[in-house]
Amino acid sequence: MAMKTQLTTPHNLRVLTVSDYEDNALTQRVEAKNLGPVDLIVSCGDLAPEYLSFLRDRLDTPLFYVKGNHDIRYTLSNPMGCENIHARLVRFKTLHILGLEGSIWYNGGVNQYTDKEMEKIIFSLWFSFWRKKVVHMVVTHAPPRHIHDAEDRCHMGFESFVKLIDKRNPDYFIHGHIHKDFKTPAERITTVNTTQVINTCGYTILEV
């Protein structure tokens, strides 16, 4: 699914975003080499490290990722050639990207955080926010609270992400974690203030 988005400052980049499950249609397009040019791949978690390495190698494109709550294998086998951006504000060309891994705490498993813990992680980045001035894209596994999330404990979003959107006004907030069958690209998007919150379960292609 390709989406052309409207930004105040276009970056002229084509970004492939993936999350949660390996989409057969994407795999076929990658293997057939008919996906078109991709400048950057972004993973929002819960994907096998081998799959991320496959995408990175076949598309010969940098790949940034955050881990999801089911990415227990990453402690032993990180995706080769890919870059973990959790708790970092990184730059790709003109795009400033913030990464935040994991889900809300629900049973004490890996990559689970209370809202207070996540808020502390975000606060610890204050110098990066000050130095780079702007956040264009936030990449997370879980959604913000009451935006695309659910009411069972595992799939609740983070209140701290809502505060982050209100304070930093990123152009994009890209997440996974919430599995849903989308009929059109527009069904993935909720606009909050000036931020496009996008559920990228499966995959999307953003033209930014």
Label the model's feature ranges:
Residues M1-R56, F127, R131-V134:
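N-terminal active-site segment of His-dependent metallophosphoesterases
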Residues A2-N12, V18, T27-R29, L76, ...:
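Binuclear metal-dependent phosphoesterase catalytic core
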Residues R14, P62-F64, E83, H96, ...:
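Conserved beta-strand segments of alpha/beta enzyme cores
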Residues T17-A25, D71-M156, G202:
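Conserved catalytic scaffold of divalent metal-dependent phosphoesterases
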Residues T17-S19, L40-D46, F64-N69, I85, ...:
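Active-site neighborhood of phospho(di)ester-bond hydrolases with catalytic His/Asp-centered motifs
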Residues E22-L26, L47-S53, N69-T75, W105-G109, ...:
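Active-site environment of divalent metal-dependent phosphoester hydrolases
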Residues R58-D60, M80, V192-N193:
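Short, structured coil segments at secondary-structure junctions
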Residues L59-H70, F158-F161:
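A short, gly/pro- and small-residue-rich
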